[in-house]
Amino acid sequence: MKLSLSPPPYADAPVVVLISGLGGSGSYWLPQLAVLEQEYQVVCYDQRGTGNNPDTLAEDYSIAQMAAELHQALVAAGIERYAVVGHALGALVGMQLALDYPASVTVLVSVNGWLRINAHTRRCFQVREQLLHSGGAQAWVEAQPLFLYPADWMAARAPRLEAEDALALAHFQGKNNLLRRLNALKRADFSRHADRIRCPVQIICASDDLLVPSACSSELHAALPDSQKMVMRYGGHACNVTDPETFNALLLNGLASLLHHREAAL
């Protein structure tokens, strides 16, 4: 699996791996790259079955497989210890990595994540699946911003959204791959295993997230032994895109604090 690695800013700089959500594209993290690359070696990638890692996914594709193939690719690139920043599905992959490779994951940052899918989130995905089946990729892509961004943010950026729709449609991961990745997301349940995650965790959520209620992050916080939670008052599901200044400050402060905390505990 192809990875994109930034040059380390100094010798032995910590590694931060960015894992996007259901869309799977590493470019999702563009608003974070410049600030992170000043302090860390940053790893981005298109998830298997998407972007520049095309593949046909098995029907039983799982979050555990997503975690295993990423860890193997990192080890092949010479990276054995790393912090993980995951958004939504990416946060699930991050938790799986922390469970399966505890010696490798130094810190986990969960952005609008959850223990198991909330009834409201499931309802949103049911509607989106119906759109996919009835209207195809175009209907899926055109509806997606409604679940990602605040209404006023979208209204002020209509030309940008039209351009993003065209790009997303041109690089659509395919109906079968999308549904198999979505099914993996819906099957994931960390409610019985979260207390085994021993690395420090930063939880970031947006109170106005339409897709994933912020209560899901509160449940995560209660279940994870060594976690801290930060709430953004504005930003929607893609809060790192809509309010990168606020998000980046939270992320940079959290990573610095938790990595120091981890080193001090060793």
From Swiss-Prot:
Output the GO biological process annotations, alphabetical, semicolon-separated. nitrogen utilization; uracil catabolic process
Q: Name one GO cellular component term.
A: membrane
Q: Which cysteines are joined by disulfide bonds?
A: none
Q: Where does the secretion signal sit in this chain?
A: none
Q: Which reaction does it catalyse?
A: carbamate + 2 H(+) = NH4(+) + CO2
Fetch the InterPro entries from UniProt.
Answer: AB_hydrolase_1, AB_hydrolase_fold, AB_hydrolase_sf, Pyrimidine_utilisation_RutD
Q: Which UniProt keywords apply?
A: Hydrolase
Pfam families this protein is in? Abhydrolase_1
- Top-level taxonomic group: Bacteria
Q: Write the Enzyme Commission number(s) for this entry.
A: 3.5.1.-
Enzyme class (EC, first level) = hydrolase
GO MF terms listed in the record are: hydrolase activity, acting on carbon-nitrogen (but not peptide) bonds, in linear amides
The text of the family note is: Belongs to the AB hydrolase superfamily. Hydrolase RutD family.
Function field: Involved in pyrimidine catabolism. May facilitate the hydrolysis of carbamate, a reaction that can also occur spontaneously.
Kindly provide the name given to this protein in its UniProt entry. Putative carbamate hydrolase RutD
Source organism per UniProt: Escherichia coli O6:K15:H31 (strain 536 / UPEC)
The primary gene name is rutD
